[in-house]
Regions:
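Internal alpha-helical scaffold of NAD(P)-dependent oxidoreductase catalytic cores
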Residues: 38-129, 171-173
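NAD(P)-dependent Rossmann-like dehydrogenase/reductase catalytic/cofactor-binding core
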Residues: 114-177
């Protein structure tokens, strides 16, 4: 009897990782799973890398979950997965760095984390609606060099370096108006 198809969910690995299974593919949710019981969120994007008819079956399954499928070439899987990893890591590092800064101002750790996450959520909503450049606010976007200087003067070396890195990233991406 023919073997059933097999897929794996490792975003950076090609379908060949399942050799010698004849019908194989990748079906990777672009979502963080901090626990084994984290449910797939509606509207999650799934990267699909498979030949036909498996690709059609995976796209249909993705839609049944209320999610979206994007077709990927095997050679693009490491780039795709690196984007996912970097997005999460940069976000979480920013929550930690900025949260620590707020605790120096009297916030409890939980207050600081909540405040930073709420701030980010608003910016991310705007970025999703209108693009990253439209979501950018603050002194860099206004060309307010005086405020940037005051920020840098108030920060220790570690936090000043992190702040400058964030400004450079925004400038390098052409997001400031």
């Amino acid at each position: 009897p023919p073997r059933p198809p097999a897929v794996h969910c490792a975003g950076a690995s090609p379908p060949d990782a399942l050799s010698p299974i004849a019908t194989r593919g990748v079906w990777h949710p672009l979502m963080a799973f901090p626990t084994r019981t984290t449910p797939v969120a509606p509207s999650t994007v799934f990267g699909v890398c498979a030949g036909e008819p498996l690709a059609c079956r995976l796209v249909a399954l993705t839609r049944q979950l209320g999610c979206r499928a994007v077709s990927l070439d095997a050679g693009d899987l490491p780039i795709y997965h690196s984007a996912a990893v970097e997005a999460v890591h940069r976000t979480l590092a920013s929550v930690e760095i900025c949260g620590r800064r707020l605790t120096r101002c009297g916030f409890s750790e939980s207050e600081a984390t909540a405040a930073v996450c709420d701030l980010m959520a608003g910016s991310l909503r705007r970025a999703r609606e209108a693009g990253p450049a439209a979501a950018l606010t603050g002194p860099l976007d206004r060309g307010d060099v005086g405020t940037v200087r005051r920020h840098l003067a108030a920060l220790d070396d570690e936090h000043a370096a992190s702040y400058v890195d964030a400004l450079r990233l925004v400038l390098d991406q052409g997001l400031a108006r």
